[in-house]
């Protein structure tokens, strides 16, 4: 079993649990009520006029390195990244492998004017809608972890905002 297989196994269980806590219809309501989308793509393109667009990552831990930062504060990191010239944020929300949290995304985005990407392992359109409900401006679809059909479904679910595909 590969690491992606392990992640997929726990993610599918997590998604089913989440759907029991917040129904699909309720998460759709929350997504519609979310703050306006900040255009991730436009921010990168605009920044490239002056050289490059920097996507700054907010990550507490990783499977390979373990805990990266003990004094982890997503809001302070987001603010520091913005002040340091970052163009966009990438916020890890996966808990088991990266010690992430959905609140990290919401709070980091709230503390800046930067567009924010939800970096997680996406397998279900529920997660896409949930990302928008959390005020994500963009999602990441990791192509190595989904079928082409799943990727199309996820991208279609994010059609009104921007999705990135990571191969």
PLM ranges: what are they?
Residues 2-69:
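An N-cap/entry alpha-helix motif that binds or orients negatively charged groups
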Residues 39-43, 74-80, 118-119, 127-128:
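Short, charged beta->alpha transition segments
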Residues 55-59, 92, 117-119, 142:
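A cross-family glycoside hydrolase active-site/sugar-binding cleft signature
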Residues 70-89, 111, 130-137, 151-154, ...:
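Alpha/beta enzyme core
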Residues 94-108, 121-129, 143-157:
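Active-site-adjacent beta->alpha loops and helix N-cap segments on the catalytic face
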Residues 116, 120, 127, 133-134, ...:
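Active-site beta->alpha loop and helix N-cap motifs at the rims of alpha/beta catalytic domains
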Residues 165-167:
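Conserved small/polar residues in nucleotide/adenosyl-binding loops
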